[in-house]
A protein has these predicted regions:
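Loop-helix junctions at membrane interfaces
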Residues: 1-206
Length: 206
């Protein structure tokens, strides 16, 4: 395969991953019900794109993930959408520039870090399954940990007020979200990334 052909194929793959992210973000396909919790799966195409296409493509897909989050939280907001959109306000609380940081930075990193984790693990582990699963878990936790902690840093009191908690209970509520949403999401991401990633690596090349 010559360089031009590979570049064209990579662009097609990137467009497919981008399309999947958009569809998942706008439909229930981006969420898996786990009892009382809905696990977000939109970051999984970002992780897979990073592993298959490289960190630059992963960063672009992560940026798209952030953009879809911004659009959804602006057009169909929830009580805490001000943490993701500077164009939404709740009572006297408005989103601002930090909302964009929360919306984009963690998601872009989700598209960068798995590429390097996978390459590093492949030097130690011959099988693809474990490195893929680890990348899925780590990529998902990067998103959850960064988003929730940045919310606490920049919007802690406002977020707590919207959730009906205050004072020391705010960070406990943050930790509760990480435990009840973040960990199940990471497990789901690990399983799907390993299963789908093995097929894509086999038929789509590395």
């Amino acid at each position: 395969m010559n360089h031009a052909t590979k570049k064209t194929q990579d662009m097609v793959k990137l467009a497919l991953f981008a399309g999947i992210i958009v569809v998942m973000s706008m439909t229930p396909l981006g969420y898996i019900p786990l009892g009382a919790v809905k696990a977000t799966t939109i970051h999984i195409p970002v992780i897979l794109g990073s592993i298959l296409l490289g960190w630059k493509a992963g960063a672009a897909l992560g940026g798209l993930f952030g953009l879809t989050s911004l659009i959804v939280n602006t057009l169909t907001p929830s009580l805490t959408s001000f943490t993701f959109s500077p164009f939404y306000s709740l009572g006297g609380v408005s989103g601002n520039g930090w909302s964009l940081v929360i919306c984009f930075v963690p998601r872009i990193l989700v598209g960068i870090i798995p590429y390097f984790v996978f390459r590093g693990l492949k030097k130690l582990i011959k099988s693809d399954t474990v490195p893929l699963a680890v990348c899925g878990f780590i990529g998902s936790m990067i998103n959850t940990l960064l988003v929730m902690n940045l919310i606490y840093v920049f919007f802690g009191e406002s977020w707590g007020s919207a959730r009906g908690v205050a004072g020391d209970l705010i960070y406990k509520a943050i930790l509760a979200v990480i435990a009840t949403n973040g960990i199940p999401e990471a497990i789901v991401a690990a399983l799907i990334t390993a299963a789908v990633g093995k097929v894509l690596l086999k038929f789509g090349g590395r």
